Structures are given as C-alpha cells and as structure tokens.
Regions:
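C-terminal catalytic lobe of FAD-dependent flavoproteins
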Residues: 217, 247-253, 258-365
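A short coil-to-beta-strand element that immediately follows conserved catalytic motifs
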Residues: 50-53, 131, 182-188, 299-308
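A short, glycine/Asx- and small/polar-enriched loop/turn
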Residues: 63-67, 93-100, 141-148, 157, ...
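Helical element adjacent to the flavin cofactor pocket in flavoenzyme catalytic cores
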Residues: 103-161, 165-172, 347-360
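Dinucleotide-binding Rossmann-like beta1-alpha1 core, especially the glycine-rich loop
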Residues: 15-89, 99, 219-221, 229-231, ...
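Short beta-strand to alpha-helix junction loop
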Residues: 23-34, 58-67, 103-123, 132, ...
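Flavin-dependent oxidoreductases
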Residues: 140-251
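Glycine-rich FAD pyrophosphate-binding loop
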Residues: 1-11
Length: 365
C-alpha cells in the first residue's frame, strides 16, 4: 500500500458500534462493547473527532417487531444500554423517522477512523516501530528461532513472531505462510451515497433498519458523518475483485478464485431473492432511495450523490456459512487474523490486546 487506511479502515460508515447485533459471549460482542469505550477514550486522548450520539433501529411495520424485540433482548444480554420507544418518543430523537417502534442504542457513535489509524501509526513510530509502505509479503516460514518473512522487494525479515492482519488478503497471506485455513475471503462491496445538503435536516444522527434475518448484513442505513454530511448505505453485492470498488473493477483471476470456492455457490443458493434485491439496488438509485424512504419519508433518488464504496473482507466456509465471529489462527510463531469484518474497527484496540496475548502464548510455548 502507498498510504494508510486505503481499504476497510478508510471506507466504512465511520460508526462506533455498541455491540448490539452479536451473539452473547462471542468475540464480536465482548470486544465491541469494550471496544466502543476504549475507542472513545483513545479519541479523547489523541484529540480525534468523535461523537457518542446514539442511534435508532426502527421497525417500519408490524412484521419487523419480533426482530426488534430480539435485538432488545440481545442488547440486554450483551450489556448494551438500549430502550424501546414508541413512535412519538422515537420522533423526539429523529423528528422525520417513520416507525411503529424503535430501539434507541445509547453507546453507538461516529468517529474518524483514518485519523485513529494515523494516530496508531504515530504511536508505533514513537516506540521504535517502522511501517513499511509499498512492501508486500511474498511468503513466510517458521524457523527454529522465530519467523522469516520474504517480501516482494526481495528482502528477508526475521522476527520472534509474526502477526498477520491482511484484511482482503488474509487467506492469501495465510496460505503463503503455510497455513491451511478452512475459510476463504469473499469480497462484498458496500456502496454508499451522500445525501444532498438541502436534505441533511432529515437525519440528526444514525437511523438503521431491523436487519433482514435471511441476509447476513445490516441493511442500508443513514449515518451522520463526524466531519459533516449524511451517508446512506451500504448495500452488499459480490465484488468482482478484492479491491473492486465499482462494477468496472474486474480481475478475472480473482473473480475465478471467488467462483471456484464452493461456499460462494452454497451461500448464493440460500440467498437468491435477497441477493438479487441487492444487485437491483446497486444498479438502481431509485431502488436505493426507496429503501431509505422506508426509514425517512421524503428521500428521493435525486437527493443521492455517489460516495466512495467499501469492500468487506468476509470469510466464507466451504459449506456456504459465513464465519460470524472474529477468527484468529495460530501456527508455530505465526498469528493470523482470518476474519475481522465489522465491528472490527470499533473493536480494534481490544483485538490488539487479544493478539498481544496470543503472541505471548506462542513465544512461551
């Protein structure tokens, strides 16, 4: 990479997640709940822009009430402060929202994640570390005394241990380092729009739908960005390359690699209808706007301006099941992060502590 935060860190909703959605006891649940607080504390210490503004998850009709109730129960199980609201109470928080009931999640917020990344880079430099931009990993191997990493620039780097957090290339790096992960990264693009400034008054903070239980993403939502403006999205469509930020970004070899993984076909078979809906929404701004207007009436296609898309690095097993939790695998003195989609940005400092513990364990073994 030529710079920091070029992919998932710099191309997301900028949301600090409260830990609402994840199974109790999972790494995602525990690390998001703790991570939100540690991320806010880090931002305060470093002078990074953030706002613990809260969010609404809204049930737009009666059919979504059971799903909203399940989220409220999960919030309680995970220790997330949240309360159910009737429509009048919801409109005190978001005056233009349309709902039959809403869940107000107090510890959700927004933050400048690229600024967090730059601050962490400064911390690394202050402690004598070095970030080697423009250098790729060709392979790595364990040795009697640690690990040797061979780079694309012809260097061999030696260390006591290796921690690999390769995002969209996590599985490739693991394979190049001699591991055999039982899941593969399949890239899903999330497309965003920015609301026209004259319509920003429609959204105060964050408005989310009740997730469709048939599809493993949260649905398009409305998010106030920490430096201003309202972003809408993301949807979720298969990217045609790992860094496929538009439909024009195609890499035949990478696409063939995705299509060759049996898990993708199994996932597609189970999600034909919602998957097709996502593709239509990707190709039609009118359909995208229609999804948003369920949450906030008055948003039209003409109000949406294209914004930078992101690609989610999602690990997918051979049977088509998505790896739902964070996944870390160790081998010898290597520690590989094989699945870290949302809420990994929120949980970044907690994940770092977890990885530091893993390194201590492999060095002691």
């Amino acid at each position: 990479e030529s710079a920091l935060a070029q992919h998932q860190t710099g191309r997301n909703s900028g949301v600090v997640h409260a830990g609402l959605y994840y199974p109790p006891g999972s790494l995602k649940a525990r690390m998001a709940v703790a991570g939100a607080q540690s991320m806010y504390a880090y931002a305060r210490a470093k002078g990074i822009a953030y706002d613990n503004c809260g969010k609404l998850v809204v049930a737009c009709d009666e059919s979504e009430l059971p799903g909203l109730d399940r989220l409220a129960e999960r919030a309680e199980a995970n220790g997330v402060p949240a309360r159910l609201l009737d429509p009048a109470a919801a409109r005190e928080i978001e005056p233009y929202v349309r709902c039959v009931r809403a869940l107000h999640v107090e510890t959700t917020g927004i933050i400048d994640y690229p600024a967090v990344c730059r601050a962490l880079a400064d911390d690394i430099g202050a402690q004598g570390g070095e970030i080697r931009l423009g250098v790729g990993v060709a392979s790595a191997e364990s040795t009697p005394h640690g690990v040797e990493v061979h780079t694309t620039t012809g260097e061999t780097l030696r260390a006591d241990a290796l921690v690999a957090c390769a995002g969209l290339y996590a599985d490739r790096v693991a394979l190049a380092c001699g591991l055999e992960p039982d899941a593969r990264i399949v890239p899903f693009r999330g497309e965003y729009f920015e609301l026209a400034p004259e319509k920003n008054y429609l959204v105060r903070n964050l408005i989310y739908p009740v997730p469709d239980p048939r599809f493993p993403f949260l649905g398009v939502h409305l998010t106030r960005m920490v430096h201003g403006g309202i972003h809408a999205g993301p949807n979720a469509v298969l990217a045609l390359r790992r860094e496929g930020y538009t439909w024009r970004d195609v890499d035949v070899a990478e696409l063939r690699e995705s299509l060759a993984w049996p898990g993708l076909w199994a996932l597609a078979k189970r999600n034909i209808v919602p998957g097709a809906r996502e593709v239509v929404r990707s190709l039609s701004k009118r359909q995208f706007a229609a999804s948003l207007s369920r949450l906030v009436p008055g948003i039209e296609a003409a109000d949406l301006r294209p914004a930078a898309a992101g690609v989610r690095a999602q690990a997918l097993r051979r049977d088509g099941s998505m790896v739902e939790d964070f996944l870390v695998q160790t081998q010898g003195r290597q520690v590989h992060v094989l699945n870290a989609p949302s809420p990994a940005a929120t949980a970044a400092l907690e994940i770092a502590d977890h990885l530091a513990d893993s390194v201590e364990q492999v060095l002691a073994s």
